Amino acid sequence: MNDAAPDRQASVDFHLQALHPWLSRQDIAEICVNRPGQLWYEDRNGWNRQESGALTLDHLHALATATARFCDRDICPERPLLAASLPGGERVQIVVPPACEPGTLSLTIRKPARRIWPLSELLRDALDLPGVPGASQARPDPLLDPWRRGAWDDFLRLAVQAGKAILVAGQTGSGKTTLMNALSGEIPPRERIVTIEDVRELRLDPATNHVHLLYGTPTEGRTAAVSATELLRAALRMAPTRILLAELRGGEAFDFLQACASGHSGGISTCHAASADMALQRLTLMCMQHPNCQMLPYSTLRALVESVIDIVVVVERRAGQGARRRVVDIWYRDGLPAP
């Protein structure tokens, strides 16, 4: 055994003392620090915010460094992502700048289950499952009424709140980010949001539980070349309710679809396209750039895209009308043709 291992573990344990009040609680499953002085924890009632003066930026960096050394890893501007296990068996995801906002550090701890649940308890509510004798009928789609009436503000508001996967399409300068910000404002405040951007443009209520992740390339003057795909994978370990990816450009589109299809519903993103059909086509072609998709036929990937993306909203900037930006098309997979 490495003689330094006990000292490394002791260093991690020492820096974890600031989190002991929450790590020691059996009813807490997740602990997240989005910025210094503040943490969020998830219990049976959902997410809760707690202020903590002990969680200074220096302390968080010291904890990150101690954790990296304990795992024989590095965390620094050149390697700003760390997925590891703590001495107590907890899983941790740490993100430091430039992969997150300057002056912050993102820390997500997932506590292991301390109890093995019997099947009888896990399946206690199985009678509510569709298809089981005695089960309730499928709920009607609340989006169909505003869809049929053409009440598009109500439709999109309900779509966000229902966790539909939404793609905003349009040309450069058409107002895609503006609409995405408006849609993001309808996300219920109880949710935890992870955003992924190359430049900070998405604006969320400072009081909500969210983390902004940033990617870039060496040519953009960033110290670390962290890709959107790497941040998507890291985001999945950060207990997100939903993931917002500012723009889809390449193979990361497949990772985004995988995230939306793996229990993280309600994803929102944008792409450059002039119509809903072109947006779905472009998204399919982006997926083909992913290493795991290069041998798959177009039809298979197109079917995946249409099974995951619920809604496409097309925005346009029309010259000659005061440079007016407006929604010109909405495609809803489960709806009737738009009136």
UniProtKB/Swiss-Prot annotation:
GO terms for biological process: secretion by the type IV secretion system. It comes from the Bacteria. GO terms for molecular function: ATP hydrolysis activity. CDD domains: VirB11-like_ATPase. GO terms for cellular component: type IV secretion system complex. InterPro entries: P-loop_NTPase (IPR027417), Sigma_54_int_dom_ATP-bd_1 (IPR025662), T2SS/T4SS_dom (IPR001482), T4SS_GSP_E_ATPase (IPR050921), VirB11 (IPR014155). Belongs to the GSP E family. This is Type IV secretion system protein PtlH homolog.
